[in-house]
Structure formats: structure tokens, C-alpha cells
Amino acid sequence: VENHVKNHLKNVAATLRALYEDEDYSLILIGGNSNYALVVADLIKEIVTNISIDVLAELGITDQPHAVAEAVTSYALKSFVVESSKMVEEIITEYEKGGLAVAGLRGVIYASNLYAVHQLIIDEYEPIAGKQCQSCGALGIDEVECPLCHGEMGEIEDLIDLLICKTLRDDGDVFVIGGQSPLREYDGIGASLRFAV
């Protein structure tokens, strides 16, 4: 029986590898009996070496799609909280030591206007009125004259939305945490940079 189970688990691992080769996954989550799930995780780690593998112990054994969806959603939310907290701390630390990060609305706008934003982090999305150059599109808070081309700045209703759009258009990443974070001390916004500004 033990050999049969082991062969079955190897087949499961091989199937997962085939799926991984067909698609670009960043994480494999394994549910089921926790003892077998750990064995499957070890087998998969031998086959798929460059992808994260985790066991969803709370899932248990189920064939109910809603139970799987709930467990995966819960895992994703917990992971997002951990990752976003880590990103916020890294940005604040890098900013405070004068590295490749900015914090605060003015700093982020300045970096965005120079196409330097790599990852934009917003703790809680709230529309903020601002300015945009009518000539070159540069963003601002209260400037009368464009900081880049010295053109006329016009009023805009949602500066944060334009920062998000501009970051994505410039091949950056955007993370909206959806709650208060240590970035609140810096207008609730920060960014890691591609280059120093």
C-alpha cells in the first residue's frame, strides 16, 4: 500500500510539473491530509525547484470547490498583508537612508514625473485634487507653473488615480493596501525607484 501511495503522489507531482511548464505559476498550494500534503510538497520541491510551495493545512480533505476557494482566498489575503507590510517597511527604510525610494505625495509626484517609479504603494485610496501640466502632462499638487516644461498647470479632480495610471503606463507596479499603514506618516503614499532622483 505504501508503494502504491508513493507512486500516486509521484504522479500528482509530475502532473503539477506538467501544469507548471504549460503556464507561468508563482505558487503551488497543497491541501488534503496534512501528512500526505507534506510528502507531496517534498516530492514537488524535487521536481519544481524555482516555485514556492506551501501546504494549506486548514483545507483538509474536500472536493467542494467553495471550500477550496475560501481557503485559497484566505491564504492570499494573509500573504498580501505580510507582503505589503514588508514592502512598506522596505520603502520607508530605503527612503530614510536616502536610497532608491521616496515617501510622501510631493516626492512620489516628483519621481513619477521623471519616470523613476518602480513600485507605487498607497495605503488607502482616497481621491486628492491636484494639478496637471496642459503641455507635457506632468503632475503636481499646487504648482502654478509646470516643474518640467514651465507650461500652465490645470486643475484635476483625482491626482492619485492619475499617479496610478501613469505608474502602470510606465511599466511600474501599483499596490493599494486598503487600510492605514506606517506610510500614513508620509501622506499614505510611497514608491520604490528605478534610479535615484
Where do the PLM segments sit?
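Terminal alpha-helical anchor/extension segments at protein ends
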Residues: 1-197
